[in-house]
Each structure stands twice: as C-alpha cells, then as structure tokens.
Amino acid sequence: MTARHAGRQQNAWILMVGLAALVVTLVATQAQAPPKAGADFRVKAYETHLAMTRASPYKDQSWSFLGPTNVAGRIADVAVADYPAFRRLYAGSCCGGLWQSDDLGETWKPVFEHEASSAIGDVTVAPSNPDIVWVGTGETNIYRSSYAGAGVYKSTDGAKTWTHMGLADTQTIGRIVVHPTDPNVVYVAASGHEWTENEMRGVFKTTDGGKSWKKVLYENPQTGAVDLVMDPRDSNTLYAAMWQRERRKWADPRTESGFTHSGVWKSTDAGNTWKRLEGGLPPGNDLGRIGLDIAQSNPNVVYAFVDNYARGDKAPENTRNPYGVLIDYYPVGNEIYRSNDKGATWTKMSGQDDQQKLFMRNLSSSYGWVFGNTRVDPRDENTIYVLALGVSVSHDAGKTFEGMGRRGAPPPTPTPTVPAVAGQTTTAGASQAGPGVNRPVATTSPGGDNHAMWLDPKDPNFMLSGNDSGFRVSKDGGATWTRAAIPSSTFFDMAFDMDTPFRVYGSVQDHGSYRAVVDVSNGVAAMKPVAFESAPGGEGSTHAIDPTNPNIVYSAGTYGAITRSDLGAAAAAGRGRGGSTTNIRPKPETGDADELRGQWLAPMILSPHDPNTLYFGLQYLYRSKDRGQTWERLTPDISGGDKAQLGEVPYQTVISISESPMKKGLVYVGTDNGHLQVSIDEGKEWTDLTMKLPERKWIAKVLASKYQEGTVYMAQQGRYDDDFAVYLYKSTDYGKTWKSIAGNLPAGPMNMIQEDPVNPNVLYTCNDFGVYVSTNGGQKWEVLGGNLPSVNVMDFVIHPRDHVLVAATHGRGVWVFDVSKFQTK
C-alpha cells in the first residue's frame, strides 16, 4: 500500500468515525428529547376529537360491531360495589374501558367508552358510598400492547357519568385507595411514564375529592408506585410498593445496575411522612415489581410478592430464556415475604425446598413486571393467592403453593345470556353467530396471565378474577369458574380474502389468530355480531391471503416467525385451523454477525403484481417468488444495527413494507427505529431516505400510492417515546421531500394510513381515539361515524369489492363501516 493510498484510507476512516459519532449523538439526543405532545396535551386533544365527532358530516352513519362474541380481552382490575338490594361488579379492561354487571357477571355493559383513554389501570369503589367510583387510566402491567392513560376519573352516580380529576401526566396508575369513611380522601399510586423518565409518579393524595392533589411520596423520575394498601383498622397507616425501572425499545423493564430505590415504604400519619422498610427484604438493586396485601383478619400481617432479579441457580449449558437469549444463571424470580409486626421485620416464606423454589421461579417465567399482585384471604391470614401466569394458593403463609383450577367437579352448564352493549347486542341463543355467542363459558381454570382478584369478605366461595383471557367468576371457592362474555378482544392486525362473502383475519393478544365471515349482502346496518373461529397464526401475527385462492393463508409475526397454510378441506368444513401449515422462515446466511431478529408483528405482504411473490421483513428485507419456498435477501441490515440497541427484545427491524401497485419492484421499507429505504429496480439498488425524514420515529406504516407512481405516505409514531403528537406525511417525489398531512387531526399516535381503493382524493387514518377520513388528500380530516367507542384502532382494511372498512381495535374487537359514499370520483 502506498503512502498516498494509506493517507486516503486513514482520512476516510476518520470521516467514517466522525460521521458515526455524529449519528450516535443525534440519535441519543433525539431519544432523550422531551415528547412534543405529552399526556396533558392528549386530554385536550380528546376534547377536540369529541367536538369533531359532534360536527362530523358522517356522525349519523353507524359502525356495526362484527365481534368476536366468543373472545374476551385482558382485564387489568376488578372491583365490587355492594348496594342494599344487589351487588355490582366492575371489570377494567386493559384497553377497552370499564364494564359493569348488575347480575354477578351474567351480562355486561360498557360504562367508560368515550373518555381520553380506554386503558384502565385500576378501578376502586368508595367503601362508604357505592355510587362513588374511581378509575385510574394507563395500565401498570407492561406489555407489548400496554397504553398510556390520561389520569384519574371519578363518578358519583354509579358510573353513569365521569369527571376528569387530573394527574394526566402520570400515564400509568397502579392503585387507588379511598378512605373508608371519608370519600374525599383518596390516594393514588402512579407508576409514571412507561418509556421515559418523569416526575409525575409516586403516591398522590387528595383531601377534597380530587380537586387538588399533593405528591406525598416521591423518590426520583425513574421510580413509581405500583401498589398501595391501607390498614383496614387504621386508615392512617399505608404501605406503598415503589419500583425503579427503565423500559427500552430493545429491553423489557428490569432493575438496572445502580438502581436502589425499589422497595416497600410505610406511613403512619396518613401519607404525610414515609419510612422505607428493609428488615429482611431483598436489597433495592435486586428488586423488581412488588405486590402488597394486608390480612384483614390480623392487620399486623403484611405480605410482599417480590420479583427478585438476583442471580439464582446456575443454568445448564445452552439454556435460553423465553426470548431465546442464552443465560448462565436463572434469576431468583418470585418470592413471598411476610411481616408479623406491621412491616418492621420480614421473613422469606417461599422456596423452602428445591421443588417449591422451582415452582416460584417459574411462576412468572422471566417477566414478573407483567404481574405482581397477591391477595390474602379476608378470614385467614395464612391463606394467600399469588397472581402470575396462573393463580396459585398457599394455606401455610406462602411456604408451599398449588395451582388453582386443578380440582373440583365437572363445570355446570352455563345459562345463555346477552351483554347489554350499544351496537353489540344480539338475541339470546341467536343462531346467526354460531355456538357460544355472548354466553358465559364454564371452566375449571381461573385463566392465564393474571392481574386482578377480589375475594368476598363474607362468602369464602365467591371470587372474581381478571386476566388475559378476560373476567371470571367462581362461586365454589375456585374449584370451577365461569368466563364472562365481555366483548373486549385486543386485536393487532386485520387482513381480508376475496371469497364471497369475504372473511377477515386478525391476531388477538394472548389468544391466537381468528377469522370471521363479513356478510354485507343485506347492508352493514343489518349485520349481527358473530363468533370468530381459529385461524392460522399466533397471538402476535400479521396475515395475507392469496387473492386468487382464499385457502392459502400466510401468517407472520411473533418476533419473525412466518408460515403458509393451505386450509383446503378444513376450510370447506368450516374450520379455520387445519389443512397443512409450512414453516417458511428464511434461514440465516453464512457470515451473519447477528441472529435473525423480527418485530413482535413482523411485516409481510403479497406483491400486488403477483400473488406468488412475498416480501418479509426482519432486520433484512426478503423476497420470495415461489410462495416462501425459497428466499432472496434484498438488503443488508437496513436498521443501522447499533450494537448498543440490541437486547432481549428484538429491535432495529423492518416494521412496514409497501410495493407500488403502479410499478412492479418499486418498494419502500420502514423500520422501528425510523429508517426508510426505497428501491425502484426490484431490490437491485436501494436509496437511504432516512436523513430526509422529518422525524426519526417508529414507522408504523409506509404506503406507496396506487394513483401516482412517485407518491408515498408515511405514518410515524411517538408512542415509544411517550409522545402523542401527529406524525403523518406525504411525499410526491419518491420520498425525497415530505409534507405533513396532519391537518386538523387532534392527536396521535397514528397507526395506519390508507388510500381509498376507488377515489384518489380520499384517505383514511386511525389513532387511539378512532378512525378519520379526508376527502381532499389530507388537508382536512373528519371523524368517521358517530358510534365507534373511543378505543385504539390498531389496523384497518378496505375491501375493494364490497366497499366496507373493517377496523381492528385493541380493546373492543372488530367493527365494520360502509364507505361506498366516498367511492365516487
């Protein structure tokens, strides 16, 4: 090598290092920047959304609820209001608002469906007045699909009407405690922002019914309150569980090195002062989420359900955790601690032998931050329940546990009932929806992934449970359970086939994938809710169906899995799952520096020019021209591949793909960390558009226009930065320059953008409030319809033949809207 060439190479190397440092600095600066639109903005934006709904020219056109009537969604909390003549039950949906039942869970109606957030963290009834109900919005249970709230709400008329009572920027609420005799005294445990640091976390108190609040317990911007309990005999004594955490896009929330503020605090003067309790509890740097409860029969006894991150037993060689990451040691996992002296000292009760130690370690697998609640039997201080992947009970103060739902008589035959739901009502036993419609289902299990439990202080046989499969009631001490028919399913995606009538496909959190027939032959208004049937795919999947053969179903997702199913005879027999399913995931290539990684909802599309051609996104873009039999890798790692942002949760991956319907091989690819690339020659060469983007945000949707070759749309999200501004753009020069088409949209995050399949002037988009339509290319937006609940619309499709928009909500199932009026040029 000559000196001249060496000098050039050295200069090039210096330039590369400098540019890399600049990019890292820019990304870090952007990641630390405060959100452009926080939760306070969101509350005001929702008021704008309501005003837009009232003024919408389409307010009198209704959505029809399609279902599913047989799949419920995640319940974050349960509560009971006892009236002289009856008992009222409440179920707080993670994402579908608050539901109410006056017949012990037989029928339900929504009572919190038009507020600034449909994400429920906690629901509490004032002990002194059953008409006073408090709701804390924003779920403390951190999921792939947990959403920020908008503060606390109060009802004084049994949940008929609601008033926003502040604390909007807390974003997640773990617990609300109301004074036993003075309903104006209320405490709120706020866990704070999910993704970023903030000071609106800790324990808050009001003495005037929520008109004003005082922060009475606060540690730092990373530490929030996740649980709060009050001594049943001394209302001045409270215990708070504090959790110091950070959540990153590439890692779930765990206690970081140097985090020492997680623990249990106690106040004996109604929250004015607090003292940390340490005698016997694990040190703060090992503590994760903590759940608390007090024995009502003996308030000296306090239990702490602890997620302990300390190193436990050595793992066998090549052991992987549930994320597929190699580990050397198991974490200690869940533990039960008991205090017999009101928190002065603590004794570890669980894991007394190897069998029980293993039981506790597996109780929450490796994600204890999702669970973390314990309940003490109101009559027996030694009987406790812990809520995790399952529900487990101990009758010896936590020394030994057994799983519930493994004993008891055969389940009784359920009585057919109908939920009282506006826009979602069917007749009892209605045949049009198939078996199991709107009926409670008997089971011997309390459900999986458990978050809430209520134990009747007067009747040891009556129990309520809230979990990922919905709301359940037991009237025999937990031997058998009845799953309530609350239509609150949490969909991630939506796809359609071209059969007649057509079907829609979607995946549901913690349930799997489902499909249903959409029969609009008598009009959308005449549609009835239906039960959905199982379909190919998992709980986090995207779908695509061959437009020439509705039996060929592709499903991708769950961190990069992808399959092709030929339903064949199974579909003809009315069974959505069956036939043959083939794993068609691309294989790693020799020399790959990293393992293949895909998002929770790894994107996959069929080419609009050839149904045998698929595009699939991991950290690379792949294309198959033979229905997934073979693949070619079209790009290098287009996400940037920053090693510092590679963790147990796949990140820096492709999240959206679009091929132009006008030009074969004109392909756009967007990533979760804000990279965008385009190819105009079928993937031979790529142009990086990243530095031309207005924002470096999660690219929820990139859409190549079907009307103008150079036009492309993009919806970006700030959700994972706790940012609720609108990022919606249009380019008319293949992505070189961008113009905002946010117009009068009230707030984000925007989940989707679509063109009308007939009218080039019409666009549709959606966010956490609903669906919007523009008839002038995005200059002005209107709320679509007047009766859709205020809920996160994750995805929607527009059927090109049947002129309907089908929306997949995360909390209220699937809804259908007639868009034929927009389809005249």
What are these regions (language model features)?
Residues V27-Q30:
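Sec/Tat signal peptide C-region and signal peptidase I cleavage site
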Residues Q32-K825:
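Beta-propeller blade termini and top-face loops
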Residues I14-T25:
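Bacterial N-terminal signal peptides
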Residues R4-H5, L19, H543:
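Absolute N-terminal positional cue centered near the fourth residue
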Residues M1-Q10:
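N-terminal secretory signal peptides that target proteins for export/translocation
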Residues Q9-W13, E589:
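Short N-terminal leader segment in a subset of presequences, especially plant chloroplast
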